[in-house]
């Protein structure tokens, strides 16, 4: 095997590899001999399978494994030539050429390494912002939202029609093609009007009903409805309204205050409002960071700092962005890319954005190190569990699915990014200015 390698720049090296047919055959023989000591095969005792029998049945698989082993050895050889360590490698080698001829291999590959990233003066790029002001009206609305969690529906006494936000107690029965269907009937059912728990059109059809009134509501089941025998079909629901209920907010007494402010020895309405004000301010800052500041800062970082990028990572990102764009094209539009020149031209159009994306990833990684921002495995699991609870998934299954997809590193990186920007833009960061103003 011949390996020659040369550094192109700090982050990339070119390597030329030539593996003779004899070297591949010798490696195949070596793997076959090793397998013969443990392999079981009908007609032979375990560990006594002849090498010839193994080669006859598994030569294709052994050749593939042998080539992979030799290419790994070639990478090791290339690293020695350019005086780099395996721990410096990022991503997989990028093959610019890979030819098989007469059982031999000739390849040209690019090995990429972690770039040298220096961010001197990055603090000057952090955008300034005005601290959002929270109004009493917003605090009152937040307080009402909080109290609604402890509210209970109570029947109204006034004579009025059902409106959005009310709770309706009613009987209903559904019919498709004039026939009642399973699961389409209930009595004294309680439903919040406007909650969209029922199929589209049902809750809207109930608005305006008064207690004791009956009505036929015409709806159409969604095409993607879970019960396939009903999906896409027209239906009629016969309903009778028995009671209209409104949420009654609880009194903000000492007992409720204690449950809302368990950390306070002497809880009060004033302390609750102060806590809600702080929450609202943080929510506004978080929104401001995500909607504006983060993008401004990221663009400034990418524009100011320049360093050599790992070619293989850029190529991978280019491929990913290109393939993602193809998913949005029609079959007719996709036909255009059967032309190799147009295919390459379209793929190349994503190169600049890919370079910016890769550069930002390494900048964020370096910033996280500079500011000692980390995400523990426990924090990662908690974030995934929280996501599962939000969407009604089984937490452990949700975590396992991400593991199978190999998505944990990407999720961890996104959490580090979120934590990093929160740290950079936090209130007591002396590297930015704040002015009190109403947002």
Curated annotation (Swiss-Prot):
The keyword Transcription does not apply. The keyword Cytoplasm applies. GO terms for cellular component: cytoplasm. It is found in: Cytoplasm. It catalyses: [protein]-peptidylproline (omega=180) = [protein]-peptidylproline (omega=0). One of its GO terms (biological process) is cell division. Keywords: Cell cycle, Cell division, Chaperone, Cytoplasm, Isomerase, Rotamase. Its main location: cytoplasm. Pfam families: FKBP_C, Trigger_C, Trigger_N. SUPFAM superfamilies: FKBP-like, Triger factor/SurA peptide-binding domain-like, Trigger factor ribosome-binding domain. PROSITE patterns: FKBP_PPIASE. InterPro entries: PPIase_dom_sf, PPIase_FKBP_dom, Trig_fac, Trigger_fac_C, Trigger_fac_C_sf, Trigger_fac_ribosome-bd_bac, Trigger_fac_ribosome-bd_sf, Trigger_fact/SurA_dom_sf. Residues 165-250 form the PPIase FKBP-type domain. It is an enzyme of class 5 (isomerase). Its EC number is 5.2.1.8. One of its GO terms (molecular function) is peptidyl-prolyl cis-trans isomerase activity. Belongs to the FKBP-type PPIase family. Tig subfamily. HAMAP family: Trigger_factor_Tig. Involved in protein export. Acts as a chaperone by maintaining the newly synthesized protein in an open conformation. Functions as a peptidyl-prolyl cis-trans isomerase. Consists of 3 domains; the N-terminus binds the ribosome, the middle domain has PPIase activity, while the C-terminus has intrinsic chaperone activity on its own. This is Trigger factor. It comes from Campylobacter lari (strain RM2100 / D67 / ATCC BAA-1060).
